C-alpha cells in the first residue's frame, strides 16, 4: 500500500478516536458508563477480528476506524468509572495520574512496537489483545453485578 493510503487510514483512525467525544458523554448518561466502556472493548475486539480477516486496504482502514471508536468509548468510559470511585476532592489528581500512566505506557510501548510486530507478527498482535479484552469485559460485568447486589441489599 502507498504512503498516502496508509496516511488516509491513520487520519480516519484519529478522527474515530476523537470525533465521537462530542457525544460520548451523552451516550454514557443515556446508556451508562459501564455499557459504553463495554461497547468500546467490543469494538476493539472487532477491530482485531477484522484485521485478522485479511491484509487488503479495506481491512486495514476498517480495523483502524473500529480501533479508534473502541478507544474513544473504552477510554472515556473507563476514565469516568475511575473518577467516580473517588471523592470529588481526589478526582482531578486520580485522573491526572491515570492519564500520565496510560500515555506514559503508550509512549514507552511505541518504542517496542516494531520489535513486537517482528517477533509475533500481525496475527499474533491481533490475537494477543483478545484475551485482554475478555478479561476486562469480565471485570466490568463482575463490577456491575456486585454493584447491583449492593443496591438490592440496601433496598
Residue ranges and their predicted role:
Residues 19-33, 117:
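Helix-to-loop junctions at the C-terminal end of transmembrane segments
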Residues 73-87:
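Intracellular juxtamembrane helix-capping segments at the cytosolic ends
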Residues 115-133:
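A membrane-interface helix-boundary motif in multi-pass transporters
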Residues 35-50, 130:
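Structural signature of the two symmetry-related core transmembrane helices
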Residues 58-66:
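Paired small-residue
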